[in-house]
Amino acid sequence: MSRLRVYRESDPTRADEYTTLEDIARVAAEAQIRFERWSAERPLPPGAAQEQVLEAYAGPVKQLSEACGFVTADVVSVSPGTPNHPELRRKFLDEHIHTEDEARFFVEGRGLFCIHHGERVLSFLVEKGDLISVPAGTRHWFDMGPEPSFTCIRWFSDPKGWVAEHTGSDIASRFPRLEA
């Protein structure tokens, strides 16, 4: 079940928690974050290739691309069998920004998408069917957990795809992580 925990930047031990789609979307919107629940029921073979995932979700990919001006989409899929998953986890765990909007739709699995907004940290447990989109310049990080298992579609305005600018902050290390 999707969940949002909102922490004060200065206190990673206490949070307000939201579990309904309506509450999560409302609190997210207050921080200029888009959170929606989409259908993720298209059949995919185990270990589906990027082309298979994008083809299965061609309609939603095209619709969001046209609505938001995205020019490319890719698929990231990580499992415990992915040889470099510890390095991938570390790569996404540091707080960073993008110079473009970022959107992710979880086709399978789950992850912890954290937004550093003002003096708060919004920690979204995103799961199959969740779409989260953040505007350019939003400080954030993503935790796939020690035993990752997810597939998500990512949209970009820049044809180069995922390009992060790390902030140098250690804030992500002070907040709860996604555990197995």
Swiss-Prot record:
Disulfide bonds: none annotated. Ni(2+) binds at H96, H98, E102, H140. It is an enzyme of class 1 (oxidoreductase). Keywords: Amino-acid biosynthesis, Dioxygenase, Iron, Metal-binding, Methionine biosynthesis, Nickel, Oxidoreductase. Gene3D superfamilies: Jelly Rolls. One of its GO terms (biological process) is L-methionine salvage from methylthioadenosine. One of its GO terms (molecular function) is iron ion binding. It holds the Pfam family ARD. The record marks D101 as: May play a role in transmitting local conformational changes. InterPro entries: ARD, ARD_bac, RmlC-like_jellyroll, RmlC_Cupin_sf. Monomer. Catalyzes 2 different reactions between oxygen and the acireductone 1,2-dihydroxy-3-keto-5-methylthiopentene (DHK-MTPene) depending upon the metal bound in the active site. Fe-containing acireductone dioxygenase (Fe-ARD) produces formate and 2-keto-4-methylthiobutyrate (KMTB), the alpha-ketoacid precursor of methionine in the methionine recycle pathway. Ni-containing acireductone dioxygenase (Ni-ARD) produces methylthiopropionate, carbon monoxide and formate, and does not lie on the methionine recycle pathway. This is Acireductone dioxygenase.
